[in-house]
Each structure stands twice: as structure tokens, then as C-alpha cells.
Amino acid sequence: MTVLQPPSSVCYPLNLPIVPNPNLDEATRKKLTLECRTGAAVELARSGVFVHGGLTLPLNLTIINSLQLQKELILYFGKQKDRNADFKTLADWISPEIFFLDLISRTWQRINTTIDTTSENELNNGLSFKERLFHSMCFTESNIYIFGGLMVSPHNGYELIATNELWKLDLKTKCWSLISENPQITRRFNHSMHVLNENNENQDTKLIIVGGLDNMDIPVKKIDIFNLRTSLWESESKSDENPASKGSSKILVNIDGMPISLSHDSNFSVLIENNQAEIPTLALYYPQREANTSRRGTDDGSFSTYAHDLDDKSKLPKHHHHHHGDLKYFESDDADENAVKTLMSPIVILPLLGNSQGARMTSNPTQNNKENSILQVPFHLQYPSGNYFNYNIVVIGFYPDPQPSNLHCFIYNIASGKWIRVNIACTECSISMHRFWKLLIWKSHHQALLLGTRTDDFCSPSVQKFDHILSFSLPMLNGYNKLVNTKHTRTNNGIANSHNLNVNLSLYDHLPYSNSSTIEHTNPYTVTQGYSLDDSGIPRLTSTATSQFENYSRYITVPLEMESTSSIFPPYAMVLGKDALEIFGKTLSDFEFITADGDSIGVPVYLLRKRWGRYFDSLLSNGYANTSFNYEFNGDTSNIISFSPHTASKTTKFGNSSQSSNGSLEKYFSKNGNSKSNSNTSLKKPHSVDFTSSTSSPKQRAISHNKLSPSEPILCADEEDSRSNTLKQHATGDTGLKETGTSNKRPISTTCSSTGMVFRVPFQDMKNSKLGLSEQSGRSTRASSVSPPPVYKKSTNDGNDSNCTLSNTPLVYRRASTVGTTTNSSVDDGFSSIRRASHPLQSYIIAKSSPSSISKASPAEKAFSRRKSSALRFIASPNQSRQTSFASTASTASVVSSTSGRRRNSNQISHLGSSASLPNSPILPVLNIPLPPQEKIPLEPLPPVPKAPSRRSSSLAEYVQFGRDSPVASRRSSHSTRKSSSSDARRISNSSLLRNTLDSQLLSNSYGSDIPYEASIQEYGMNNGRDEEEDGDNQDYGCISPSNIRPIFSTINAININGNFKEGEFFSSKSYINNEKSRRLSYISNPESVESTNSNNNAIIELEPLLTPRSLYMPWSTASVRAFAEFFYTAQINGKWLLAPVTLDLLIMAKIYEIPILYELITEVLYKIISKKEEGLSVTCEALLNLFQQKVSRYCNENEGKIRKQLDSSESYQDTLEIKRSLANIDNGYVDSYLLRNTSMAQSIHYTDDSNGETEIDMHHTGISSIGSLANRAVPTVFAGGPRDSHNSIGSIAFPSNSGVQNIRRSVSLFSPATKKKSSLSRETDPLDTSDQFTDDVPDSGPVSRQQNFPRRSSSFTETVPTEPTRYNYQNLDSSKSNRASDDKEEQNEQATLQDISNFDKYKVETLQKRNSNDGKDLDRTNDPLKNRGTEIPQNSSNLETDPFIRDSFDSDSGSSFRSDSDDLDSQLGILPFTKMNKKLQEQTSQEFDDSIDPLYKIGSSTPGSSRLHGSFSKYIRPNSQREDGSEYVNISSLENMVSPNALPPVDYVMKSIYRTSVLVNDSNLMTRTKEAIELSKVLKKLKKKVLQDISQMDDEMRETGKPIFARGSSSPTLSRQHSDVATPLKQQENTRPALKFASSSPISEGFRKSSIKFSQAPSTQISPRTSVTDFTASQQRRQHMNKRFSTQTTHSTSALFMNPAFMPSAVNTGRKESEGHCEDRSATANRTNRKEDATTNDNDNIAPFPFFGKRR
């Protein structure tokens, strides 16, 4: 039984457009909604989906042609008698509307469009854009293009005719224009259209039109090409210009010269531009079928059999066809007896060259066996839909019939020709419940989307519905074996660069292989490799500054060498990010991460809020809420802010004064304050979405749209104008201020009286709040105006798009004004443009009426007015630099100031310091400076809540602002990740949330009323405008509960569902995370974070900068946190990052902290590592099988019968074949069922043993705390509430371990960790004695305890003959369930012991250090567990070693676990302890298990302090370490070295680390793949030993008979060494410590030894680690010494050695013999296989590996 690998898919409902008028007739209503379509055109562009046209009737079409369509229409209306009377023309039932789906909010919108009548194009005169169906649509450069389709005949309203019109919709103007109606172009429908050279600025953008039918239902075989720049049809113009070459430029859809037909319903085509040939190529899905087999079981007379008849008549030259069922093979004419019957693929490649011939691709040789049923489905898909993603074609289709349950998804890897099955089952419901009909690729988010309907409506896929979507992740594309058979390896024959139009392209010459080591093709923004060539192919000789910068960009932002990894941003954006990080990082930073090592890493808040998103906002809001709560309830005092009700009572004089934080950086780039802010700045991307104009429901969206035009989304670039059209205009009552214009605010500087430092409230614009500079210089300014939080409105004549504010708080609108100004006071507009974005501005105080208010000021005011504010100087002198103050170092991107046009305006966020100082506040925190009195409390009634258009109503503006040549014209950031639907969880108004908080009290008291909770629901729109009916329809997807409310800045205290306030209760981030995950479009953080908190349009009080958090403690190493911060700058995976701990840490951080794009990018890398492991296992299997076959052939004297009999009877050979089949199954997308069954059984036994084994474990005094529950076992240190003071503990988030606060603090964990049982380490006396007791007790503890404590290395290599020879060792796995259980038990014990060790106090650590240093010699001589292990080996294989952790912890070579403060990080959150890894590698090195270079530790394993190298990688960036040496550490274990094409497969403990990390992030697919690789590696090690033993036995027999042992051409010395090693007694190693040196039996290890022998055998490296712990300087010296050797010799020599293709077979094969976590075969026989593979694989074409990687140019 085959089981698919776990799915990564999630389903989401979509909000369909709302009917603008319920009284519309049925035909019109269906046009204006998306209930159903037939023949609509669908296209995904950036982060949205467009749908246009189509019949509004559900027609189940088995065949799509005009005749069949009209028949179905007649039948449909014949059944609908009530519609016959209303039927006038078919045009009534064809929609002309275009709809847009925002993938972020998952909401459909209808776009109101018009016909461009002002165009100079004569084609538009008198024309109307008619309804159509079965047309094609594409998107490029802010335009939508539509070609062809069926229209209603102008002469007959009942007839449909094809058209050849090409229309363009300009999304800027939303106007349709006809750009071509060339009669020479064939009319067609049911075709496809692609955009060529969209991202290549050096080539003209062209439209490629493929397939379809003409007016007579005859297939159109010609490909038409339209040049968008010249507006000419190239497919016709060239032949017209040159009659002699007429027809020469035509491109026909063909296979080997035989024309074929393509129809959109039966085939699909994708355009591949980034191939090695640099020739755009179409990949067509065109399956082969027998002539008598109709497409869908229909009559043979259908048109769809036409193409297959052609194909069956075509004769493939030079190949003979064979049939197996419906699958076709061809056999080469080569006389090679080993020629493989190759299955022909349904994928056809067709280069876009004149008269080029298409070629059908072949399938991967590993999938050619006729028993392989996986190929039956993708070769016979019905209603196929496909798309292209990074050298893979993702395909969905139905087989054997179009039932929803028969929908299959496959991935076709172009490089290897392999088909991989993908599980797309919905995790929340059965797949049969959903019906999907269309596949889309969301490239920016690495997601595949399936569009359809939630419930099965029993319609065929021709019926299109749009209410449900399924997404699944695409990083798994890296996780499959892509080895290509050497027979099909491409040759660099120059055809790719030849422009000979008549060349017949061979099958593999134009495969879209990855191109060069720079992998520029992986970046969707980079142009093709010919970007420096013009159309003539001549390199450009000119070099401009732009081209130089582009070259520099590509040089500095080289992605990882992975064929399926794409960058998020274009290179220039990443360069800007890198420069900002490395050059201006400190200058820009106003926030810092505090790492577990105590280091500080600066980063701008603006950047974090933009690209981290709502999770960071929640952290900020919680931190701000905690601070304000402490000020309010605990009376905490501060030097900056003091609580003085007396002072506050004097502040009423300037009650109208306001503070707002309208910190849009775009204002700086506005040419003047009144100009529209459409600036093309890199800070505001053209495709950025303004979340400030948002509502949370389609109801509000419809309301707001109707004010402009019915159901019309706002596509204008000025996204704020839409808000100004919908905001209700409110007067301000007794303020006496008339709203005559826009009142955009300038910030108010907050100045500390003691130091004069300017605490900058985020700056704003001052529109009508103008005050002349000369006048203002004579007026007093004040640091902080204390007033009720203002609410502003934006008038319709305001041009600035970043300053409109929405509010739902019970406040009135007030205009901003400066001190002593009236409504006509002004300040020079130039300030808004000359001021730097980072400059603090002078504080402006709003006077009530006239300048005379200054003269009436209180004495405090007058005293203060005599002081000139330093902020004034910033206005007067635009060249003034930033002040070195607390506030100025916190840049404009403060918590509230970092806003842009696409996020909320900060004047919605009030500063707590001011709001808390309102009258009637119980405690009034005010600045410790003289403050004026406050205004009287206004008594006017509260205005109604203004409503505004949807948050994403302007999202289409991201498509329309800039052309291709704009530097910001790239698609929106993939960090613009998904947020939960705006209608899901934002139904509780913020005003109700704030009811009992300090701010809400102030607000209610200010206006003399306290609004009841229920009233707030009704009056202030808790349901956000959703009516009862709508709520009822969507109750499945969202409910009103506090857990559904995202934490917001103003959320100071939590409320329960009844609105009751619980003192000290805050929103739980954990529940917030868990509840949000269910409805997001993939556990995604929304970088437009503030928008997500503001999408409910409720008021958000301004933040007080003095209370704003400015640092965040992150319990991770400095290296990990630095990489974490770097990602926000560059949005790229840095190849220099270490796999452990950095990358694995980042995976967990991305999951916990909700950064999904980071998660996707890291999983891509991890899948690539897994695939390299599986490739290595496959190569090892092939090598073993071929080696065994050669030996058997010699042994049987080439007698075929004897050879077959011998192979069939060889158990080891058959078992190896089983492993090969298992690897093939895994690579095809299935789970190995036998491994799965054994693993699940072992796990269940393990859980049963947990509670019972506790006493027994403690009996041995191992110091392992009892863990009795599955939850604690599955969740390691960090989440199980481990030692509070350890670096890894979540509880240490608030206090670094060196803060001295250990026992008195309470945990501030976001996850509320469970209480941990007391560690048994508290009663430990001496770890050395414990080790001795443990080893002494082992023989008497019985077999059960042996199994529990020694399973990890209970390999069978010590046995001469396996005690349990079993087929595939599966029975052995079954019989070793207790061993398997104890494997996991041991891992659990390691984690628990690491927790407890980290809980040691300094006294015990110092005692242990002293004792260990005193007992060093004795320990080396007598107490070495390694020696004890050696003496026990012959007695019992399970006693191969003592408990790994005990040995690692207490052995003299790794005793630093107790003595190094950095070793608390050794386990790194689920990763294997690095001391243990180091020990295993030392053994591996000494016994030479394999020739592979361990990517993590082989280099440093000879250095006793190597655990510091990686286990505590952050050591190198501790303040007292040499930071310059950091780059020298990361070479071997860096990602670029682990995933490069020539990298060696990872050793098993690397897989183990990935597996443990995948458990932490609960990634079932990643867990399954890694666990399978680990288990198969273990089994393969045992089988390798058995195979080599069988070979050795055959060699002995052959010696006795005098036969030659080695076949001609084999490397007999190497093989003989391997064979002799099998019988080598292990006693040679029993009494010797594993020397830290390389054995000299392998050429690879020899070469490596030469490069590293200087430090591997240096005397200093033999110093005991105990001395290095007590003397840190010595350790530093050793590391520096190693670094010098490492950087100068090792990297170069090993790179040169292993990049040599001659070494690749053996290098690959060695990757499976690595030291591994639970069952290592540390046999010296392992290297035999390496040498045999050296001898055999080089001579055997069938297994020569890596042609895909090795043939890179």
C-alpha cells in the first residue's frame, strides 16, 4: 500500500463580491457577482488574481468548441422554462466585468472600468468592449491584456463567433483600449497567452499566443507574437517585409515537425525563459493516447481526437515505439545491450525560433519500469492545469474521471524528467468536499494555489467557481532526487548559442537547466543570461552607472546554488538592504535585540514593523501596555516622567494641543507639503498596499465603494484619497475651529527638562497649521502638550496621501495648530520638503483661539516660554544633523512613528504620557517639566464613527504606479505576507477594548460619559458594519472572541467576552498565535503590520515615546539573532550562515515569531540538504549492487544462470534492492510504509516505557530528570519549561543569564511553560563517580537497562556474521523495538540532562572545574569511558559504548559541558548536543568510517575546544572575542557549502538535527523525510557490512580456487584493503584512545590530511579540555591558531579536492557512512565501499552521478 507524504496544504474561504443592489434582475446580478462562470479568463499577477468575462451559467462541457457550446446553451435554456421569456440575447448571460482577488485579505472586488474614448488610436472610435468567453488574459507592466475569445455575433444574438481583438486595460485609469484588430491574425478561442521578456529590460516585451480553435472549430497550430513596444504582430510583419523569406519566421506547434493542436481545456503551455540555451521555450502538456481513445471517454468523432490522430501518424525518427498499456516507449538504435526502454513524457518542449521542431521529453530512467504505476496518472490527466516554478512544472488534473476525489497533483522536474506526486488533501476536511479546477502559482510567496468551490456541486471542471482556495508550499521542490542518467547528459555543443533556425533541437540540448554558479536565473527579477546582449547578440560595449550598479548588485547578492531557490527582492533591493545593514546599520537603528550572549544588535523599528509584521507589533503593544500598566497601577517613578496631578491640573490651558505621530517617511520625498505623494521612492514600493484605508468586512467595502461608484475598488495611486471620499466630516463643537482645510499634523517634540534632549514624537506634516518662521522663533515652544488624543479628518482637497487618520474613538475632530496660532497662522511650506525625515521637529502647541493666549499663560508657561526649544533649530537649519540624544538615536521609525502611506497614520496612536494626563485621571504621569493648565472637559455628544473603504480597496494601486523601467517596479515584497481575512476577527472595536484601560477612562472622562460595552458594540461598530445575514453566512470562519483580536498598541489590558476588565490581565500571545493560524493564508506574518491592527478602523491612541520599548531580549545566540536581523534587511538566505545553530534556530524563530517567508526559504535549504542525503543513499545502493554484481559475475565465471541464481539467493543483495525501491518511493512522493509502521510501533512502546523507566534511569544516578508525559517528551527544553536560567529557556527572555537575576524572577514566557520536575542533579555528588558507577552497574542492570541505555551504537559491525540476517532488516527493526524506544529515550535523557546541567549554580561549576583539573591525570589513565567501552565491545554489541551523554558530559575530552558557560547552548533547541557530535566525529575520524568530510565538525574535530566552534558558535561574537575571526568559522558548515552542487551528502547527525528541529516546528513533511533518510541510512549501513562480508567470502573462495579476484580495470589495492579490513580484529583499537588524526587508507582522506595535518596533530591540540576551560586565553589562542590554518589551507585544498568530478562518485557515496545519532556502524569496513565505488562507478555509466550538477558552465 502506498501512502502519500503528509500534505502541506491549507484551505481558505474567499469573500465573494457583494451584490450592489438586491433588486437587480437575475442576469445583471450574475454579471456583477462571481457565483459561477464558464469560460472566464483567470490570471494571477503579483499578489492578486484577475477574472474576466465568461458565461454566467454553469455549463458542463466535455468538449469545448463553438458547436458544442451552443448545443449546451440550447439544452440549458430548454430546461429553464422560466428563463425563456426573459431570454433576449446571449450577451445578457456573458459578463463583461473584471474582478480582482486580493490574496492577502482573500476578498474579491469588482473593478469598474470604462472605454477609453480619448485615445488617439483610431481603433477605439465607435467601438465598445463586448462580452466574451474562452479568451486569454495576461498581466504585465500595470496593464491587463485580453485576446480573442468568443463574442455574440452582431448579426445574430444567438450565435457565438471568434474574434482576434487585442484589448488593454490600464489599471491606472481603469480604461479599456483596443490596440490591435489585424485581420491577418487568426481569430481564435480556447487558447493560451504568455508574456515574454517581462523582466528583461533589454528586450521588447511580447505576447505569445498559443493553441486554440478558429471560427470553424479547426485547431490553430501557428503561434502568434505581438510586440508591445512596437504594437506590431511579429508573426506577420517579418514575412510581409521580406517576401523572399515569407513563412520562414512562422512557429508552428509541432512534435518533430508534425503539427499538433492545443486547446486550453485539454492541454496547457508554460513559457520558460531562464534556460541555459537562453532561448525562450514553450513547455507543452500533450499526452500521448491511442487513436481510438477519446479524451474523456466521449465519442471518437470529437475534435479533441484530431491532435492525437496527428500524433499517432507521426513517426519519430530513429526510434522504435513499444506500447505498454497506454504508455509509449522508444528504444534507441544504439547497439548497446544495456539500452533502456525509455518512457516518453507528455511534456513537449518547443523553442520559440522560426521553424523550430518540438521534442517530446523522456521520463527519468528510474521511473521507466512498467510496474511503476505513478506514471499512469500524469500521462493521462483530464482537464489539466499547470504552471511553472523554478525548473519545475506543477500539474493538476483528473484521473480516471473528473470527480473531485480524483484530482491529482504532480510536479515534473525538468532537469531530471521525474514525476513527483504531491499530497494536496485538505487537512481540515476530506478532499471530496472541495472541487478545484484551476492551478495558480504565487511565486512571490512560494505557494501553489488551487481555485475552486468549497462543496462538491457535481459539476465538471468547465464550471468555474471562486469561493474557496487551497494553498500548498513549494519549498519541497528541493527535496527530491534530481540525478540525471548519464546517457542523457547534455553536451555543450554550442547549439544553445546558435541561431540557425533549421536546427533540430535534441531532447536535452534546451532543457532549462540551471545555468552557472551565480544562479542568476533563480532570481525572478534578474534578466536572462543574455542581459548584456542586444537583439543582434552583440555584447554592449557601453557601461553606464546603472549597468555598473546592476553588475555590482548581482555580484554582491548571489543566491545559494540551488535550482529551486528564488530571491524575494530584486538584486538592487538586496544590495540596498546589505548596505543599510553593513554601512548605515548603527545610524539607522533605533531598536535593539539583546541576545542570549548579552550582545546588542541594532535594527530600525520601521524595518521590523514593515517586514516582521504583526507579531512584532504585538510584542511592542504588550511591552508598551506593561509599561503603562506599571505607571498607572504600580506608581513606578522615573527621572523622565513623574506623576504630578498638581502639574497636570495646570495643563488645561492648552487643552486643544495635540500630539500625533504621523511619521510617514514619504513626506520627506514629497516635493512640497501640498503635492501628491506619488513619489517613486524605494521606501514605498509601487505595489505596496495601503492598509490604512481599511474596513474589516465586504459590507463596509461595498458601502464605501458605492459612494464613488458601485462596487468599485480604488485603483488610484493616491490611496488616501479614497478615505477622504468616505470620511464623514465632523465639526469640533466648542473649539471654535472651523474645518476649512486639511489639518495634518506636525509632531510635537518631547523635551526632557533635565538634559534638554529632544524626545522626538514622530513627525507629521503641517498643512494649514502654518506659522511663519520669524513669528514662531519668537514664540515659546513646549516639550509636550498634554491633551485628549486628537482625532483628525482629511478633507477631499488634501493632496497628501499619508496623513489621513481614521478613528472610532469618542473624540471630535480637531485641527492642528502651533502655539499661539490662529487658523490663518502659517509656516513656510518648504519645511515639509527640506526637513530630513529623521530630524525631530519643533513641538507645536495648539492654542485655543488667538496669539493672546500666550499672554494669558500661567507662570509655568511664561517661564517655559523663555526657553527656546532646541527643536526650533532643526526647522531653521535643515542641514542640522541629528542630535545625539535618547530620542534622536531612536530614529523616526519608533513604535508609532514608523508609518508610511501603506500603514496607519501615527496620529491615530496617542502618546500615553499625554493621554494619561487628562483631567480626572487617578494617576497622571506627566513629563517632569512645567506644563500649562489643561482645557475644560468638552461636553458635546460623541460623533458617529466614520467609515472608510476596505483596507485593501486600494491594493490594486500596487499594480499601476510604475512602468517596467522604474527601479521600484518589481512585484511586491514577499514579506507582504498574508494576514487573516479582514472579516474574520476584527469585530470588536478598539474603543470597547479600551473601555477600562487608562486611556479609555481618560477618553470617557474627558467627555463626561462612560460608554457601556454593549453600546460600544452598537454605536462604534463592533461588527464593523456586517449585517446579521452576513455574519450568519460567515460564522464558520470567524467568531467574536478575544482570542481572535490581534494585540494592538492601544490594547493595554484584556477584556473578556463580556467586556469585564481584569486587572493585570493581558492578551495572551500564545492564544493569539494559535487562533490566528487557523485562518491565515499560511501561518503568515503580515509585514504591513500596523495595517493589520488598524483594519478595523477604530481609534488607536498615540503612544508616548518615553514609554515605547526600545529593546527586545531574544533567547538565542548572537549569531542567530544577527542573521535574524539581517534577513529583514536583505530578505535573502545568506550562504555564510551556519546550518547549526544559525539556520536551524532561524527555522524555529520563523515559526514562533510568524515570519513565513523566512520559514519557506529555510525549508527550501533543508529540503535540499535532505535531497542530497537521499541522493547519496541512492548512489550507495547503486554502488553496492553493481559491486556485488561484478563480484558474483567473476565468482560464477560469467554464467548468466548461476549469476541470476546467486543474486536471487543473496539476502543482502535483495535487501539492498528493497532499500533502493524505498528510496524510489520516497522520491516519487510516497512514504515508505514499512519504515512508517516500524517507527510508529516503536514510538508507542517508547511512550509506554517513559513512566516506568524513570526509576531505573535514576538508579544509575545519571542526573536525568524524570519526564513522564508525551508532551514533555516531545517538547524539548525551551517549550517544556526547562531551566529558568538557561539560555535556551523561554523564561530567560526577560533576563539574560548573566544578569544575576535567577531565582527570584518569574517567567515571562509567551508560552506559559509547564512546571518542570526537580532535577535529580541536585543530589549529584560527583559526575566522575557517577560515570564510574554507571559503567560498573551496566553488566548487572539486566538486558532491559542495556537496551535503554546503550541503543545508540548497538550496531552489528562487531559480529563476524550478523546474528539476525533478515530481509531488508525489517524484522530486525521489529525485533529491536525496545532498542528503538530506548533510542528516543536516550535522546530525551540528553535533553533533560542538558536542561539540568544548565541549572547548575556557579559554585558547583567551580567545584567541578577544580576537581576535574586535579583529577585529570587519573581520569585519563583509569576513568576513561571510551577505554571501558573498548574492553566491553567483544562481550556484547549493545555495550559498544556507555550512555552517550554520560560519556560526553563526564569524559575528559568533552568535560567542558560542566565547565563552559557557553555549553548551555550546545543543545541549541532540539539540536543534538555538539559535544556529543564532536565525540562521534572523533571516533569516526580515528576509525575512518568513511571518506566524507563532515560539514559541521571534521575540520575542528581534532581540536579539543571544537565544541566552542559550533556548539557555542556565538562565542566568536561575544564582546571579548575576536569578531574578525567569525568568517573563518563558517566555511565548512555554511549553507553555501552544504547545498552547493558539489557538496558532499550530510552525515546522519545533521539529519538528526534537522529532524529534531522539524519536530519543534511541527512540520510533518519535513519530519517524515528526515526520519526516513535517517532510518534508511541506518539500515543501509548494516546492509553494506553484510554485502562486504559476502564479497569477502567470495574472494576467499576464489583465492582457494586460484581465480583472479579483481576484474580488469578495478582498483584491486583499494578493494583489498577494504576486504582485509572486514576481518581486522577490533582489539587493535580496544586499548587505545581514538587518536585525533586521519587514517591514511583513502586518497580523499590522504588529501585532506595533507591540508589539515598541521593543526590536527599539533601538540597544543592534545591539551585536555579541562585546561582550556579554566584558562580561556589558551582556548582563544588555540582557536586563533586553528583559524589561521583553517583559512589559509583547509578551505582551498579541500575545495579543490572535492570539486574535482573524478572524486564525486566516492565522495557522494561516503555520505551515508557518517556518524549518526542512534545506531552507528563504526566498522572499519565502511570505507571499502568507498573504494569499490571509486573503482566501479567510474567505469559504470549507469550510476555515474551528478551530470546535472557537474555540467554547469
UniProtKB/Swiss-Prot annotation:
Compartment annotation: Cytoplasm
Entry GO CC: cytoplasm; cytosol
Phosphothreonine modified-residue sites: 298
A single GO BP: cell redox homeostasis
Family annotation (InterPro entries): Beta-prop_ATRN-MKLN-like (IPR056737), Kelch-typ_b-propeller (IPR015915)
Composition bias, Low complexity: 670-683, 880-900, 979-988
Compositional bias segments (type: Polar residues): 651-664, 690-699, 740-753, 774-783, 797-807, 1344-1379, 1653-1677
Basic and acidic residues: bias regions: 1399-1430, 1711-1723
Residues bearing the modification Phosphoserine: 838, 1289, 1307, 1356, 1664
Extent of Pro residues compositional bias: 938-947
Kelch repeats: 143-198, 206-253
Keywords: Cytoplasm, Kelch repeat, Meiosis, Phosphoprotein, Repeat, Sporulation
Domain of life of the source: Eukaryota
Entry GO MF terms: peroxidase activity
Chain residue ranges for the region called Disordered: 651-753, 771-807, 875-915, 938-957, 962-988, 1312-1467, 1604-1686, 1706-1753
SUPFAM superfamilies reported in the protein's UniProt record: Kelch motif
Function, in words: Negatively regulates early sporulation-specific genes. Seems to exert its function by positively regulating the Ras/cAMP pathway. Required for growth under alkaline conditions. Acts synergetically with MDS3.
Further remarks about this protein from its record: Present with 815 molecules/cell in log phase SD medium.
Protein name: Negative regulator of sporulation PMD1
Lineage of producing organism: Eukaryota, Fungi, Dikarya, Ascomycota, Saccharomycotina
